[in-house]
Amino acid sequence: MAIIKPHANKNRTTSPIERPESLIEEMSGSNPPIGFTSLDLAMIELEDFVHRCPLPGDNLAGQKE
């Protein structure tokens, strides 16, 4: 899988396609992230919302429970 960067510099001699692994290493640096990321928090919030939602009276097959 490759990532293509839009609006790449046309004078550039290297390919604008980079491997995700190299981008992850470049962005993470030597310090691992501490705590939850914003994606983690959003997923936790979504999971809590799903647990609070009432279940429908009909199952997926359309039969009453």
Swiss-Prot record:
GO BP annotations listed:
protein folding
> Sorted alphabetically, which keywords does the UniProt record give?
Crown gall tumor, Plasmid
* Top-rank lineage group of the source organism: Bacteria
InterPro entries referenced in this protein's UniProt entry, alphabetically? VirE1
Keyword rRNA-binding recorded? no
Query: What does the protein in this record do?
Result: Involved in DNA transformation; controls virE2 polymerization and prevents virE2 binding to DNA.
A further note on this protein reads: The Ti plasmid contains at least six transcriptional units, designated vir loci, which are essential for efficient crown-gall tumorigenesis.
Q: How does it assemble?
A: Forms heterodimers with virE2 that prevent virE2 anarchic homopolymerization and binding to DNA.
Query: Per its record, how is this protein called by name?
Result: Protein virE1
Q: Which organism is it from?
A: Rhizobium radiobacter (Agrobacterium tumefaciens)
